[in-house]
Amino acid sequence: MREMSLLQLHMIAFSAGFVMDLAAGDPRSIPHPIVWIGKLIALLDRKLLGDIPEDRTDPEKRDRKAERCKGLILVLIVIGVTAALTAAVMYASYSISPLAGVIAEAVLTCYMLAQTSLRRESMKVYRELKEGSLEGARKAVSMIVGRDTQVLDAEGVTKAAVETVAENFSDGVIAPMLYAAIGGPVLGMTYKAINTMDSMIGYRNDRYMWFGTAAARLDDAANYIPSRISALLLIACSALCGRDYDAKRAFRIWKRDRYKHKSPNAAQTESAAAGALGIQLAGDAQYFGKTVKKPFIGDKTREVEAEDIVRMNRLMSVSSFAGFALCILAMGAVLAAGR
């Protein structure tokens, strides 16, 4: 291994991390780095924003500029700490030996990817539905979505699970895969930190309306290209998955519905998935007891059924392999060009 170039070692570690996630998911015996990133974000949230007094709940009485600046400080600290610690781990590991470096990089790469976690959690929903337990299905889907699940019927639960797999295929699989392929664990973990900040403080609610601006906009920028690559992978791979999928319809629905979301990225993969499966996703949903109006994505060519969760997972798996193969081919091309 000592005679191998850093790029060759990176390719080996990247491949091993992908296989590890595919085989077992996140190593549960080791503390998950995303958990620690989340704790850092929560700590900085308390220190920088703190409790909002009742006399400042009125938007007109709050200092928007100051809150935005504090949010930007949080983003810079989290990114700096994440990148620095990851770089330190990689430097120390490769200093010990190439093998130690490859192992550390493979484990971190596995942590970045969520294909197995998405499949495992969404299939829990599927099994509860097949057993006729709507309450169990609601509880299972509540683990992976932010909406109120107690008001969902079986179709609503199924749609929520399919939407989650479709949307998280981008920010949970392809985006970290692309960033890890380009910049190794340092860039990959930095992306995961950005994504985690958005999921924790990137909301347009009373608390984070301005404090979360930097996190939300950075996440939009970081996911802009990966979300579109993810959608194209779903469209292309739907042609490989059998008669239950329609690539032409996936492309048509994607072109029509890809911007039917407040986020510039979220509907990219949802529209491709809806078209591939021939179902209608999105629509109004309840969050914290309030109905949020959302446009429908896709055409209702048939009723949504529990098997659509299985179909979505199959499409995600094939598309993940395709994304991985493209990354390896790109790295191989760079390696060949450097010789």
Question: What kind of feature is each model-predicted range?
Answer:
Residues 1-190, 194, 202-339:
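Hydrophobic alpha-helical transmembrane segments
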